[in-house]
């Protein structure tokens, strides 16, 4: 019985992913959608300020913004 409980505990920890990783889309313009498991707790989406529907890139973390780029950061899985 103790072995069964220990096994269930290990499976629960693995499934819950207590390492606090984030799943983010990680691809550039005109590439197929890919995902990446990131250690950072945020994802970003980079686009042009004048044309926000054209997404230049996506990835892990939250990079610094530049005047000619729009960067949206978020903190849930596949939010970018």
From Swiss-Prot:
The keyword Cell division does not apply. SUPFAM superfamilies: Snake toxin-like (SSF57302). It comes from Dendroaspis angusticeps. Expressed by the venom gland. Belongs to the three-finger toxin family. Short-chain subfamily. Orphan group X sub-subfamily. Residues 1-21 form the signal peptide. Shows low hemolytic activity against human erythrocytes (LC(50)>600 ug/ml). Is also cytotoxic against human umbilical vein endothelial HUVEC cells (57 ug/ml) indicating no differential activity against cell lines derived from neoplastic tissues. Pfam families: Toxin_cobra-type. Keywords: Disulfide bond, Secreted, Signal, Toxin. This is Toxin C13S1C1. PROSITE patterns: SNAKE_TOXIN. The keyword Signal applies.
